[in-house]
Each structure stands twice: as structure tokens, then as C-alpha cells.
Amino acid sequence: MLYYLFQWLDKYDFPGAGMFGYTSFRSLMAIILALLISSIWGDKFINLLKRKQITETQRDASIDPFGVNKVGVPSMGGVIIIFAILIPCLLLGKLNNIYMILMLITTIWLGSLGFADDYIKIFKKDKEGLHGKFKIIGQVGVGLIVGLTLYLSPQVVIRENIEIEKPDGQIEVVHAAKEIKATQTTIPFFKSNNFDYAALVGFMGEHAQTAGWILFVIITIFVVTAVSNGANLNDGMDGMAAGNSAIIGLTLGILAYVSSHIEYAGYLNIMYIPGSEELVIFICAFIGALIGFLWYNAYPAQVFMGDTGSLTIGGIIAVYAIIIHKELLIPILCGIFLVENLSVILQRLYYKAGKRKGVKQRLFKRTPIHDHFRTSMSLIEPGCSVVFTKPDKLFHESKITIRFWIVTIVLAAITIITLKIR
């Protein structure tokens, strides 16, 4: 909104109004404003949650030895993150930009889904919250909206990066002059770092391109669901999900920035995406909101984000990566979320396999995997065998959190470095 106001004022030479025409200025303003909202208004909102007794009431002491200190801590703090993202974007973003619109829809949609889950847990006293099938339906819904919009909107185009060999043998990356709609995505080790989903259905001949888009929509739904649930599982320790997501957000912001500048896109040998510069403003608000929230969520937490926050930030990361055609980098960049998901899935499969044989067995002491590192073998039910019993020494949750942050930083660096490997 302010963007349009200052654009109008600039016509009358209003001092400083021209600054709002620069993406860099609006991005800086977005991160500052989001940080202020989440840190200053966040404190007031936490006090409101305390007065309304919207707090944690149940903690499994067998999993969390520090759980007694967490009972009574306000939950649903994800509302702070959501408002700290939405307000700067609505004020500073171009609201006619299709990418900004999709990110705002994702934030509101998944925020509402997570809010419903937390509401049922806290106010209806149902620890299971929203039924799993309704969560999946909500996640599939946003994935379907994003996938179909990217397919149907004429604003969604790319300029393909092409490698040209010079007479001296050097490789130069240039971008095609024509903007096209394509099912291409960025992936390391492939020619020009591009992979076309349509290539997987090439046997369909003249219908391959349409089939490629259908495949893209299906992959979009899968990625949104997987990453959203991964972030939800990762939110099990003070500061864990907020810190990891901020690091991932910063990496995606760098990729969006270079994708929106044809020269930088050429340097990293990735496609140029016109209009994606508005995504930098969104991700700056996202990072600012998470850092401000982390002020209160770091150990010992004064507030928890709840599913209101975790489902939302996971979905935001997924949709953002899809929009900038970097969804196939998610297994590397969001490796922590992937491992959290896999640990839960493998644990359940292994446990059920043993149950059919009449044997109590587990792969890990506890899942998601971060709980494995703080669970003593003495807490495992008698007669249950565990495959991975190490480490014998238990770690404090703050140490586990910081080490997971470090792993995410390393994965973020690897994600960008792989784009330069040819």
C-alpha cells in the first residue's frame, strides 16, 4: 500500500518517495518492520496469551526432561510470525505481483489451518487437534492452488539459461531473449542446471508439455505437504524450527535475488525469472519475523509457535522454493526437515513390522530424531529392543538446537555451491 502511495507522491517530487521504487530499500524496510512487530507487539501478545490462559497444559516428561518448566508457557505464538510477515508485505510489496499474491495466500491459508489445529488442542482439550486428514486436505489445497496458478497465469514466465562455448573453449552463460512458460526447474549436475518435468513424460508426444504441467502440480502438492509437516515435526525444542527456518529463508532469498537479476542468474547458471524480485521483500519479512520471534522462543522459551506457526513456515518455504523453480534443491536445503520426516516414518514402519511378529522393537529411542538425542534408554518400555542406542550421553536441548542450526547452515552453503559444479 505504501508502495503505491509513494509512487504517486514521486510524481510530485516528494522528497524520498523515489526510494520506494528500489527493491533493496523495501526489502530492508520489510525486515526491520517485521523484526519490530514480532519483538515489540510480540511481547504484548504473549502477555495476552498468558491472561487468556492459552498455554501448554500437557508435556510428556519421559520425552522432555525439562517439560515441567514448559507447562504454562503460552502457545499459538505463530500468530506473531504471521502478522509480522503480512503487515510489511501489504505495506511495502507490489500487491499486483502474482508471486507476492501466492505467498500471501499461502501464509493466510496455512496459518488458518494451523490455528484451527491449535484451537482444538487448547480450547476443546483434544490433544490430537485437527484430524490428520483435514490437515492433508488443507495442504493439498494450497499446493493445488499454487500449482495451477503457476500453470495458468500469463505473468509466470522464465528466460532459459543457455551455455555457449566460446572459441577459446570457455563456457559463457546467456539467457534466451524470449520469455516462455516452462516446466523446468533448477537442479545441480544437469546440463545448464535445468531439468524439465516434461522430459519424464516425453513418450506422450505432443501432449508431453501438458502432462509435464500435470506432473508439476502433483510434485507441488507433495512438496508443500512434506515440507510443511517436516517443519511441524522439527518444532519440538525451543528455537529449533524458528532458527532452522530463518537460515533456510535466507538461502532462498539469495536464490530469489539472483534469479531476479539476469547478470547474477548467469553467474550461477540458473534461469532468469522476471518479477521475482518481489519475493525478496516477502522473504525479508519472513526472516525478520522469525528472528523477532526467536527473541522469545529461544531457550528457555517464553512462547511456542504451535502448529499455527510451524505448518505455516514449512508451507511458506515449500511454496517459495517452487515459485523460484528450486524445489528439487529442497532435499539438500531442508535436509533437517527431511530427516525428521524420515525418522518418524521409518520408526513407525519398523515398530509395526515388529508388532506383527509379536516383538517390541524401535529404530531410534524416540522420534522425531531430535528427541533421540535427549532420551535415556531407561525411559524405553521394558522388553523393547532399540537398533540405534547411541549416544549414551544425553544432550541438553539448547545444544541439540544449536547443532541442528549448524547442520542447516552447512546444508545451505552446499545448496548454493552445487549450482557452480559442472
Features from the language model and the residues they span:
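Alpha-helical transmembrane segments
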Residues: 2-44, 83-112, 144-185, 191, ...
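Membrane-interface helix-loop junction between the first two transmembrane segments
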Residues: 43-61
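Short juxtamembrane and helix-loop transition motifs at transmembrane-helix boundaries
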Residues: 61-70, 125, 201-209, 266-274, ...
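P-loop potassium selectivity filter motif centered on the GYG triad
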Residues: 180-208
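Membrane interface segments of multi-pass transport proteins and intramembrane proteases
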Residues: 18, 121-130
